[in-house]
């Protein structure tokens, strides 16, 4: 069934443009409030947000919707997405909401929903919400005596800090480490520096002065250049880059080299397997993770289960098949022993624990495999279904045959833009570049011919 509002990670768009309008946000609150409200009992929702200016607008609209549906609202303020999921369980809320567009620019925003178990909602519930939004919500409103209340809560951010700290083994601290943290001017600007400092590290923080419009602006996990420079400048042991809602993380080693999610997952998988903590016989990642990671795991008799792009698909596979480690190359890492969604701070702490335990520098700990040459390019389309074109299909088949068993080809439409993403990888860098460019050329020429 075609979706009108929900994408792979909630509802997202430009603030004050459909669907990210106060009207839609209020209807979301009404619909979700009706679905999750417990009849005859006090029901509550926790709402967090990142640091975008439009967060205030959407927050108030959601409050209006949820209270109209008869739910009490706890407003958490700026707080990481994984903290909302964790507090949803800790505070025994019936629903959790995060207002964020993750790594997107400030002018975008989004609404992510978590059930009482801290996991994102199922497709079935999202489709039910969509149907209600487009219908008459009046019958679902609470009576005048059952309208909910809203209040801002202080101190719950410290619950999350303590929770994150407890994921570090009790016999390990961060004493002696100099850490630079890039908070992306986002939701982690308070919690990440505080947790690291309380664990004993010397913490140098950058991009921790959000003003409503500087979230993710040339900073954070999508722009680690500033962090690389700062690590070199202050001779830090490691740099930690979060994104706007702190659910993803990349590291920078003491030499200023960026360490992506694939390498981080390799470290955790190897460490947890050695201590018999790894479940499922391997890890879960997406089709975009490097072939080098798959080979690294195979050499250790561990599997790599691949899913579609999107951390929700990673989590679904983990839950269905009994894995406890999964993630994406981009730095979304899900450790289900601790969290129900990607958690940048907790993931970073697991890497630091390995480094401290082994007494080795981050560069040595995190270079687990040599990535196979990989190239990703996007080609803009004018609509239609270019991947069903005969010439395009033929070019894809030919490229797949040329790459053979030593390479991979992944072609997929973007979920948010009129783009086709073409990714190839293999041991022969020249061949990888050629097959990607050939496919891009065919898609472009066929698109022009169709127009």
UniProtKB/Swiss-Prot annotation:
InterPro entries listed in its UniProt record: A-D-PHexomutase_a/b/a-I, A-D-PHexomutase_a/b/a-I/II/III, A-D-PHexomutase_a/b/a-II, A-D-PHexomutase_a/b/a-III, A-D-PHexomutase_C, A-D-PHexomutase_C_sf, A-D-PHexomutase_CS, Alpha-D-phosphohexomutase_SF
List the catalytic activities from the record. alpha-D-glucosamine 1-phosphate = D-glucosamine 6-phosphate
Which cofactors does this gene product need? Answer: Mg(2+)
Q: What class of enzyme is it?
A: isomerase
GO BP, sorted A to Z: carbohydrate metabolic process; peptidoglycan biosynthetic process; UDP-N-acetylglucosamine biosynthetic process
Post-translational modification (record):
Activated by phosphorylation.
> What residues sit in the active site?
102 (phosphoserine intermediate)
What detail does the entry give on cofactor binding? Binds 1 Mg(2+) ion per subunit.
May I have one GO cellular component term?
A: cytosol
Q: List residues, modification Phosphoserine.
A: 102
PROSITE patterns documented for this protein:
PGM_PMM
Q: What is its EC number?
A: 5.4.2.10
Which residues are listed for Mg(2+) binding in this entry? 102, 243, 245, 247
Recorded superkingdom: Bacteria
Q: Which CDD domains match?
A: GlmM
Q: Which UniProt keywords apply?
A: Isomerase, Magnesium, Metal-binding, Phosphoprotein
Q: What's a Gene Ontology MF term here?
A: phosphomannomutase activity
- Family, similarity comment: Belongs to the phosphohexose mutase family.
Matches recorded under HAMAP family: GlmM_B
PANTHER family named among the record's database cross-references? PHOSPHOGLUCOMUTASE (ALPHA-D-GLUCOSE-1,6-BISPHOSPHATE-DEPENDENT) (PTHR42946:SF1), PHOSPHOHEXOSE MUTASE (PTHR42946)
Main function = Catalyzes the conversion of glucosamine-6-phosphate to glucosamine-1-phosphate.
Protein name as catalogued: Phosphoglucosamine mutase
- Gene name for this UniProt entry: glmM
